[in-house]
Amino acid sequence: MDLFTIFAMKLLTYNDFFDSVSSALTSWTGKLQGLGIAVIIFCVCIIAFMFMFGEGPSRTAKKWLLYIVVGGVLLWGAGTFASTVQGVTAGF
C-alpha cells in the first residue's frame, strides 16, 4: 500500500461523515437553545407589558404567546431529535 492509501484510510476512520453531522447538529441545537431561552424570556416580558396596556395590544399578545410557545417546542424538539439521532447512529 502506498502512502496516499494509508492516509485516506486513516482519514476515513477518524472522520466519519455521520458522526460529524450528528455532532454538529447537537452543537448547533445546544447553542440555539441557549440563545432561545434568552429570546423567549425577553418576548414574554414584552407580552406581559402588552397585556397591561389594554384591549388592542392584548389581542396581539395572545397571538405572540402562541408563536413563542410553538417556537420553543420546535427549538427543544430539534435538540431532542438531534440527541436521538446521535444516540441511534452511535452503534453503527
UniProtKB/Swiss-Prot annotation:
Signal peptide positions (record): none
One GO cellular component term noted in the UniProt record for this chain: plasma membrane
Topology in the lipid bilayer: Multi-pass membrane protein
Pfam families (UniProt xref): TrbC (PF04956)
Regions crossing the membrane: 34-54, 65-85
Keywords tagged on the record: Cell membrane, Membrane, Plasmid, Transmembrane, Transmembrane helix
Cellular localisation: Cell membrane
Protein name in UniProt: Uncharacterized protein pXO2-18/BXB0017/GBAA_pXO2_0017
Species assigned in the record: Bacillus anthracis
